[in-house]
């Protein structure tokens, strides 16, 4: 079937569903869609992700959410019970094997974790645990729960997660393929995520609002806002077509105050612009700001400065929520205690800037207009390549270098502006403008500075 941005028919969905449920043994326990609907309908409002986001936006508050996930269900429950005392929203981060549909290896990881008495996986293998165990998780906790992963083919994971009572689902056919996988075609991952979005849309049609969040940071470090914005908007459009009504678009911190504030503000405005111009008016839109996703210094005091800076920018920019980091980022997967430290530092800063939104100023306004011009140039080309179809256009845009590198269709005046900025930096640093500048910038924060000057 040729890829198109078109709502899946009931027959198409049900035929595919039967194949999906057979991909692992726990699929047989979620065959009854109505059972999942009834379970979701019984979830109290204070545990529903979309309502928490809607309330936060209305009140002008920024919610906090960590990342967290371990192999064994009892340990995962205890971890999240600890974290929920300090955060507004809870995650369940999925392990690397599940992200690649390698459920046999995830099962081995569970066995080794039991034997070792500690997690041997970097997340929770939801598919292996199945719906009964996951319902025990969602019933025990008192905060809204989201699945966070990195899965190109997340269809079975989506089915089990929704039937288990999770009320938000992160990812998309672009953001969970290009940064994460090298053997999955974009055409396949977009089509697989149309299935995921249609599943969420079916819950919506039964009165259950599931929040969907494209993954904003992509590869994690120093992504130009116009690239991440374009992909977030594309994935939002794809989800809306499948009847999803709650969309959270995201962005990863780059470190420049004016650019980060402008990015969050322009992201919301551009998403509304494109969603509505293509006929989608019945939806809820929120934003997420990811604290610095690059390298961290080993010194905890320095790490706290980075965390606090990210929280301040998230709050002042008006982001609906912030994904927090821990002071142990340089060492690996953080402990619960380290995660709580990051949450507490973030909450202190969020409380302090809650009524101090960043004021309009020429520098931010200029950056907003620059980002908008760049995004419009790219998205207009994507639609052109697809003859009006954003799904087909996206595949062709990556092939042509429009959405990645090589042929990004920015106007000449904007290209000249960027060229002048790079040339000015090269003169200041006394070196030729090369890719080494990017490498130096990626490493700069872990060396206690923002710009990687020699």
Swiss-Prot record:
Xref: InterPro entries: Cbl-dep_enz_cat, Glu_mut_E
A Gene Ontology BP annotation from the UniProt entry: anaerobic glutamate catabolic process
Gene3D superfamilies: Methylmalonyl-CoA mutase
Binding site for adenosylcob(III)alamin: 69, 122, 179, 296, 325, 329, 333
Catalytic activity: (2S,3S)-3-methyl-L-aspartate = L-glutamate
Annotated EC: 5.4.99.1
Cofactor: adenosylcob(III)alamin
Leading EC class: isomerase
Molecular function per GO: cobalamin binding; methylaspartate mutase activity
Domain of life assignment: Bacteria
Cited HAMAP family: Me_Asp_mutase_E
Function according to Swiss-Prot or TrEMBL: Catalyzes the carbon skeleton rearrangement of L-glutamate to L-threo-3-methylaspartate ((2S,3S)-3-methylaspartate).
Name of protein: Glutamate mutase epsilon subunit
Organism: Shigella dysenteriae serotype 1 (strain Sd197)
């Amino acid at each position: 079937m040729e890829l198109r941005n078109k709502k899946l028919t009931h027959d198409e969905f049900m035929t595919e569903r039967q194949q999906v449920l057979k991909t692992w043994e726990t699929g047989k326990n979620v065959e009854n869609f109505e059972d999942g609907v009834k379970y979701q309908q019984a979830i109290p409002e204070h545990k529903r992700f979309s309502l928490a986001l809607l309330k936060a936006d209305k009140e002008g508050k920024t919610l906090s959410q960590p990342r967290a996930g371990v192999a064994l269900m009892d340990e995962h429950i205890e971890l999240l019970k600890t974290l929920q005392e300090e955060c507004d929203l809870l995650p369940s981060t999925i392990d690397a094997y599940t992200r690649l549909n390698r459920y046999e290896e995830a099962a081995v990881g569970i066995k080794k974790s039991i034997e070792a008495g500690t997690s041997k996986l970097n997340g929770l293998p939801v598919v292996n645990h199945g719906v009964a165990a996951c319902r025990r998780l969602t019933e025990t906790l008192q905060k809204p729960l989201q699945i966070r992963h990195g899965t190109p083919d997340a269809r079975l994971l989506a089915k089990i997660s929704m039937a288990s009572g999770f009320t938000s689902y992160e990812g998309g056919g672009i953001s969970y393929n290009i940064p994460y996988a090298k053997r999955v075609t974009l055409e396949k991952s977009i089509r697989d995520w149309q299935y995921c979005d249609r599943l969420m849309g079916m819950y919506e049609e039964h009165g259950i609002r599931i929040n969907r969040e494209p993954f904003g940071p992509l590869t994690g470090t120093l992504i130009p806002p116009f690239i991440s914005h374009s992909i977030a908007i594309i994935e939002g459009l794809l989800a809306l077509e499948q009847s999803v009504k709650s969309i959270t678009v995201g962005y990863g911190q780059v470190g420049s105050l004016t650019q980060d504030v402008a990015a969050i503000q322009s992201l919301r405005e551009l998403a509304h612009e494109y969603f509505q111009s293509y006929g989608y008016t019945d939806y809820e839109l929120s934003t997420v700001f990811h604290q610095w996703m690059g390298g961290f210094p080993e010194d905890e005091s320095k790490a706290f400065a980075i965390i606090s800076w990210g929280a301040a920018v998230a709050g002042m920019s008006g982001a609906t929520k912030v994904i927090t980091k821990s002071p142990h980022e340089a060492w690996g997967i953080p402990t619960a205690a380290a995660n709580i430290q990051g949450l507490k530092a973030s909450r202190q800063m969020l409380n302090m800037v809650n009524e101090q939104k960043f004021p309009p100023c020429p520098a931010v306004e200029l950056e907003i207009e620059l980002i908008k011009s760049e995004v419009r140039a790219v998205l207009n080309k994507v639609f052109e390549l697809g003859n009006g179809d954003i799904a087909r256009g996206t595949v062709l845009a990556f092939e042509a270098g429009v959405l990645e590198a090589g042929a990004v269709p920015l106007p000449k005046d904007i290209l000249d502006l960027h060229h002048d900025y790079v040339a000015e930096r090269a003169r200041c640093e006394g070196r030729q403008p090369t890719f080494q500048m990017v490498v130096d910038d990626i490493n700069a924060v872990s060396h206690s500075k923002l710009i990687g000057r020699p």
